[in-house]
UniProtKB/Swiss-Prot annotation:
Keywords: Chaperone, Cytoplasm, Nickel. Belongs to the UreD family. This is Urease accessory protein UreD. Disulfide bonds: none annotated. Required for maturation of urease via the functional incorporation of the urease nickel metallocenter. It is found in: Cytoplasm. UreD, UreF and UreG form a complex that acts as a GTP-hydrolysis-dependent molecular chaperone, activating the urease apoprotein by helping to assemble the nickel containing metallocenter of UreC. The UreE protein probably delivers the nickel.
Length: 279
């Protein structure tokens, strides 16, 4: 039963996950969840070293007033790949902000691959996401974010509302990457070359965990063969890729190719596409 206070204030979903290395096998040793967030039983499509997890949002999407809070901790040497079961939907706001906060701690020798499916902002949605990673020396993190502004398949544009996305990666109190984006829905911003340039989809992929050579950057660029606008550049401790275009499959395919390149180059792992993406 949903009480009146839940309806007025929105959901507050919580997820606390802890992964640990147990003699070369990564296990999910702690799982605390509160609806509408839930994590499926872990599985191991590439042997026990890498634990794959899928996060579910059982309510189907977020509305104004909803809060999602996730804390993910990888203990030393743990290896985890986390994705979501479906695209995240942010519905038209009732005047309140929908907000998601994600805190990650990646200990020495651990690696977290954070690969959520796209976020779809309905016109007039108000949404903010804050993601902070505490990365230990010798740890690595790869993550991406794909956002669609408006249900463009239906011809909808993001002309009202607000989107904020703040990503921070820190190591021993030193910022390795800080990315704060904000877009307010309007006709001008949707069509401006300094906004969306008429393109409803943007994406960012970030790898932090090792110096990237010029050769890797060139290979990353050569993997692109789509119609949208893209860029790839070195960070002090990794790689950044950007996309602006009109096709989710286009950006996703490029990000997957880059992810697989980085896996082979830095993690000594082969291709392993999560099954949930193929559903």
């Amino acid at each position: 039963m949903i009480c009146n206070s839940q309806i007025a204030e929105g959901w507050h979903g919580k997820l606390n996950l802890v992964y640990a290395d147990r003699q070369g096998a990564t296990q999910l040793i702690y799982n605390q969840q509160q609806a509408p967030l839930k994590v499926q039983r872990p599985f191991y499509p590439e042997a026990e070293k890498v634990c794959h997890s899928v996060i579910l949002h059982t309510a189907g999407g977020m509305v104004g007033g909803d809060r999602l809070s996730s804390n993910i901790h990888l203990q030393p040497q743990a290896q985890a790949l986390i994705t979501t079961a479906a695209a995240s939907k942010i519905y038209r706001s009732n005047g309140l902000q929908a907000r998601q906060t994600i805190q990650m701690q990646v200990d020495p020798g651990a690696c977290l691959e954070w690969l959520p499916q796209e976020t779809i902002l309905f016109n007039d949605a108000i949404y903010r996401q804050d993601l902070r990673v505490e990365l230990a020396t010798g740890a690595s993190w790869l993550g991406w974010e794909i956002t669609r502004f408006g249900r463009s398949a239906r011809g909808e544009k993001f002309l009202q509302g607000e989107w904020r996305s703040h990503t921070e990666i820190w190591q021993q109190s030193v910022p390795l990457w800080i990315d704060r984006q904000c877009l307010r829905g309007s006709e001008d911003i949707f069509h401006s070359p300094h906004g969306l340039a008429g393109k409803p989809i943007v994406g960012s992929l970030v790898w932090v965990g090792g110096a990237v050579s010029a050769e890797i950057v060139e290979k990353t660029r050569s993997l692109w063969n789509g119609e949208g606008e893209v860029g790839a550049s070195r960070l002090q401790h990794g790689l950044l890729c950007r996309y602006r275009g009109s096709s989710t499959s286009e950006v996703r395919n490029w990000f997957i190719d880059v992810w697989q390149l980085l896996r082979v180059s830095f993690l000594n792992r082969g291709n392993c596409i999560p099954r949930v993406w193929q559903v």
